[in-house]
Amino acid sequence: MHFFLYLCRQFIIVDSMRKFILIIITLVALNAISIAATIVHIANPETWTYSELRQYVGQTIQFDVPFYVCNNYNGLTISPRRIFQPTNQALPLSAEYNSILSLNSQGTISLTNAGSNRRLGERLHNLTVKVNSNTSVSFISCDWQGNTRADLERGLDMDAINMRGEHSLLVCCMNLEYYLVESLGTGYGPDNYSDHQKQRAKVSKALAKINADLYGFVEIEQGQSALAEIASDLSKNTGKHFTYIDDGGSAHSSYTKSGFVYCSDVLEPYGKLRENNTGVQNRKKTQAFIEKETGEKFLFSVNHFKAKSGKGSGDNADKGDGQGTFNGDRVREARSLLSHYESDRSYFADEDILIMGDLNAYAMEDPITVLREGGMIDLHRAFHADSSYSYVYHGYAGYLDHALCNSTLYPFVTGMVAYHINSDESDSYTYDKSNDQTMFRSSDHDPVLVGLKLGEEVVENEDITTNSYEVYFNKEIPSIINAEGGHYYVYRIDGNLIKEAPITTEREAIEGLTQGIYILNIYGNGKCVQTKLLVP
């Protein structure tokens, strides 16, 4: 202030006020230029690497595309794309696998000064940062958008269970991350009764919010107490009547199993529980259910395959192909699942089957390939192409939690979705690290939901006359050929649906797509064809 008054006096004395004002304005303008962010253009977020930051070290910049939170452990890691497990999108050791692996290794940067309690997948629009190095930037400002808790509380994620019409039956499968009632303090799951009550509160709120008619659980305590407790909580919280399938077992330390809880107002079990004890026991079970309103029957198979961790030998050794250890055992479990299905459908006198559970294998790994080649349809890929995930490990998204069905049940599937209340959340919200009593981070895996309309085919566009769908480009605009009467969905590679419409012409143009990579789903004749679009 004294310096300013001194300048004023000097310029007044020499009668040069206009010159003084000009100098002040010039100084202000120069200062504004010095703090303005350089706008950095990212041509293709799918191939962007942190090396592109090197030229901006020491500068303040603003990105012209949104960034995504990819990791929220001990700070934030961000990228202009969601980072996926390579084997969730490509066959192990294939050329595409190696390409994804290479891009993943240099596609993220560390964001300092922005905290850790952000959900994975949150978008940072107009992100302004100070570039510390080509791998680290300091947060200045952004507009946070998308993938919020409020969105999930409104049930927006669950809309996908009705992609092909309104469901009449909702099925949910969830890994409960060691839900224990009797065997507390074993080193797995809750250490004491207080921890159990906190875990129970979070899980019960999640299940009540989902409000399914049929639940399959993995990583739930052996015996009947845990299932009985969940059934009781569901009955209390929903006003409906829930019960469970008693498998006759008893609790044994922290060992877990697969189990079933169902709404007896809507469903009744048919026949006796069938167990498949190939590999890890008590974790692969099938039960048939009849929908009371329609009298329709289907088989529900809940499974938990051998984990990827530990030391293995022979075909169980880690081969460095992204599939981890015990892949051989998981392949054998997948084959046994198919062979048991043959006897199960004879016993239950029905062939419609829905297979769900934590198979500890990503979408393109060998066990899932076995199931697909055995005639099972991957519902994640059928409805969401490459964008689906239910689990995030060290910032890498993918789905270990599967939903598959055979071709006779598929026409009655209205949709499916992984409900992202867990995998995107910070680990600091778990029951043993906080007093958070919300449904968020009730487990480390997302629940997977499947909508059914039994007795009424919901497959759209049965009047499509050919399966020879083609996609071609005319002046950089993609068009679909030979799918008139069908329906298409376009997703960004991060999983966001950006465009969907009926196919009303023989050559349907998909307009309005900017440069980038997209996933295109074309529906018709009870099938879904997926392809990647590279818009130049």
Residues of each region from the PLM?
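Structured beta-strand-rich core segments of catalytic domains in phosphoester-bond hydrolases
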Residues: 221, 226-306
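Active-site-proximal beta-strand elements of phosphoester/diester hydrolases
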Residues: 168-184, 271-273, 297-307
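C-terminal outer-membrane/trafficking sorting elements
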Residues: 2, 462-536
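Active-site His/acidic residue clusters
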Residues: 292, 296, 302-327
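Sec-dependent N-terminal signal peptides
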Residues: 20-30
